[in-house]
């Protein structure tokens, strides 16, 4: 009977280790994505502040791939605002995902601790 419990603990530890590694990778990926989205937000904010100092009749071009398209100041400003909003929403989603991942690992660790306590009580 002790061998079965030891096997169960060993299996649980193996599963926990795999889950922790997977979760750490996902959390690292989320951090990288958050960093990238933060850069997008800063770039859009900087571009908007630079555009604000320009006169309204200034010809503005937006880079699309390998070409530039003539756009109005308002169109570019709207595009930058949308990009900031989208990036902000994605950052919030990624933050929530990270919290969920961390919570799930903590719950798994708590379950293992409970198994160990139950084993010691026997």
Curated annotation (Swiss-Prot):
Pfam families, per the entry: Prefoldin_2
Domain of life: Eukaryota
GO cellular component, one term: prefoldin complex
InterPro entries, sorted: PFD_beta-like, Prefoldin
Keywords assigned: Chaperone
Molecular function, one GO term: protein folding chaperone
Assembly with partners or alone: Heterohexamer of two PFD-alpha type and four PFD-beta type subunits.
Family classification: Belongs to the prefoldin subunit beta family.
Functional description taken from the UniProt entry: Binds specifically to cytosolic chaperonin (c-CPN) and transfers target proteins to it. Binds to nascent polypeptide chain and promotes folding in an environment in which there are many competing pathways for nonnative proteins.
Protein name according to UniProt: Prefoldin subunit 1
Naturally occurring in which organism (per UniProt): Tetraodon nigroviridis (Spotted green pufferfish)
Lineage: Eukaryota, Metazoa, Chordata, Craniata, Vertebrata
